């Protein structure tokens, strides 16, 4: 039903959300929130101050009701006007893109460079792996050498190679008597 078909009494008793829906259906274009409020005041024949108390609830209802969609910049429309793909395009701000330059030989060389760089990385990783394996071999050799040194040290403990000569007790007594 068109807004023109409603009586003034019916428009006064109509909920704000239903009235907004009818306004959008008749206009068939997006409207800013303030324009929507002005049109509602005009249709219901009330003062804008009379609507102020219900404005917050109306805005909430407009957001919740699935028939309406916010298009940004306080513009609203009916969801049925926009296919899903177009909604995303219209709602999201336009992204400025730079014009693509034609590929040059430098771009081709750059692509080759990427391949070379990848090959070098693989070679470096293989070298690192070889070094780790070599380190493991060295660690085993070091462990064997350390064990041999420990055994040699234990054998050396039994010998007296501190450079001191041993003196018998008898020799001590003789030295003391001479003094």
UniProtKB/Swiss-Prot annotation:
One of its GO terms (molecular function) is DNA-directed RNA polymerase activity. GO terms for biological process: DNA-templated transcription; regulation of DNA-templated transcription. One of its GO terms (cellular component) is DNA-directed RNA polymerase complex. Residues 108-179 are annotated as: Disordered. Participates in both the initiation and recycling phases of transcription. In the presence of the delta subunit, RNAP displays an increased specificity of transcription, a decreased affinity for nucleic acids, and an increased efficiency of RNA synthesis because of enhanced recycling. RNAP is composed of a core of 2 alpha, a beta and a beta' subunits. The core is associated with a delta subunit and one of several sigma factors. This is Probable DNA-directed RNA polymerase subunit delta.
């Amino acid at each position: 039903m068109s807004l023109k078909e409603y009586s003034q009494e019916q428009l006064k008793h109509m909920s704000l959300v239903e009235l907004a829906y009818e306004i959008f259906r008749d206009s068939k274009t997006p409207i800013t929130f303030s324009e929507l409020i002005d049109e509602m005041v005009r249709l219901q024949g009330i003062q804008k101050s009379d609507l102020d108390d219900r404005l917050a609830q109306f805005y909430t209802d407009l957001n919740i009701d699935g028939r309406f969609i916010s298009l940004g910049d306080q513009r609203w429309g009916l969801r049925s006007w926009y296919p899903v793909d177009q909604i995303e395009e219209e709602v999201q701000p336009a992204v400025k893109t730079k014009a693509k330059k034609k590929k040059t030989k430098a771009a081709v060389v750059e692509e080759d460079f990427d391949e070379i760089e990848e090959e070098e990385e693989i070679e470096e990783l293989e070298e690192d792996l070889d070094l780790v394996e070599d380190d493991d071999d060295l660690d085993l050799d070091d462990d064997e050498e350390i064990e041999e040194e420990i055994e040699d040290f234990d054998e050396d403990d039994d010998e007296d190679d501190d450079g001191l000569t041993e003196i018998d007790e008898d020799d001590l007594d003789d030295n003391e008597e001479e003094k």
